[in-house]
Amino acid sequence: DFCLSRGLGDVYKRQILIIAFLMFNFTGYSQTTSGQEDRAYWVNMLSQIADPLLNNMSKGELKKNMPIETISGMPNPSNARTTHLEALGRLFVGMAPWLELGPDNTQEGQIREKYIRLMTESINHGFNPQSPDYLNFTVTRQPLVDTAFFCQGLLRSPKQIWSKLSSETQKNILNALQQVSKIKPVESNWLLFSAMVEATLLELTGKCNIHPIEYAVMRFKEWYKGDAWYGDGANLHIDYYNSFVIHPMLLDVLEIMQKHSKGEVDFYRKERQRFSRYAEQQERMISPDGAYPVTGRSIAYRFGTFHVLSLAALNDLLPTTITKAQVRCGLTAVIKRHLAIKGNFDEHGWLTLGFAGHQPSIAERYISTGSLYLCSTVFTALGLPATDEFWSAPYAEWTGKKIWSGNPDVKLDKAIKL
């Protein structure tokens, strides 16, 4: 009875209202934005991530100025030799589709023109043996990984980047791919790095060593576990490597094979369906407030975990159960949830080790500053023009937000059997 007395009851009411208000705003239920606003936010965040890297490397000063943060607090020789190629290759793969739209008279088009210039200048330095920023393609096995990511970037920007590079830089890139192709991959997702390099050589020159491609395809047929999940090797790992590497690179390789009349049509068609199903699962992982399960290794790649979902939107591979608008809104919620937390960037704008802010202890020994730029792959859908439905459609709730708010308009989830 005392607790329900008038005075204390008012206090409780005020406290409840304050808590409800904070929860309501924190979860973003009232924060609906237009596609135009979301696109501007994405461009701004991608620019913020890219600026320190490209502004330095375009002048040949990346190695001079980029920090090398590791879990130990000290860069080991392996990190120091490979982190710069990691940074360029990983930023490029996520940024390339947007750059490929090319410059135009809009404000965004002028921003793109600037980054096309910075990216080409950075690539010139990275592949020029006389540049202080010449990258390592031979020492340790890590260059295989990040050259493969770089290759994806090239394939995603053939007009605005590859064709605008000088013939000398193009020759230097092809020489680097030949060097990297000698690195032997381990029996895991690494097989796709070798396949990606060879597929890129096939696309750019018409020639390649077909064996690494055929071997990787054979292995991933064997390692398929069902419902769009591949093993990372013989075993299934509950992590995000199906999104970081496996689905994007496998589909890229298979598409190039089909383009050059090589490989099986049947497996290519199956992979397209599996890719769509995995994208569907990723969309359902996003909670009402933009959080998602933190599981498995390499979580320091932050929202790069959603590479497949963003790429599915770009390549028109979303399943019929979800709309482009709800993918845009869900991914925007994820990006905002991460970046609302302080500490993701250091005082000079470089990404820091962490998942939500600065958390060095969550980084594996193979992760350093350059590794973190794989987060850029969430921005892949920026390769869709502003007029596309992805950006022009009004705000839409994603599945997690719909179902937790009691919205009856939710589709059943169903596994695929192929």
Task: Please describe what each predicted stretch is.
Residues 1-15:
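Single conserved hydrophobic/aromatic residue that forms the stacking wall/gate
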Residues 16-25:
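Bacterial N-terminal signal peptides
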Residues 27-29:
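Sec/Tat signal peptide C-region and signal peptidase I cleavage site
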Residues 31-87, 93, 97, 117-124:
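Low-complexity, Ser/Thr/Pro/Gly-enriched N-terminal "stalk/linker" regions
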Residues 55-79, 127, 132, 334-418:
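CBM-like carbohydrate-recognition segments
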Residues 84, 95-98, 112-272, 284-307:
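Aromatic-lined, polymer-binding surfaces characteristic
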Residues 94, 236-353, 360-387:
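Long, repeat-rich segments with strong aromatic
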Residues 107-108:
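Long, charge-dense tracts
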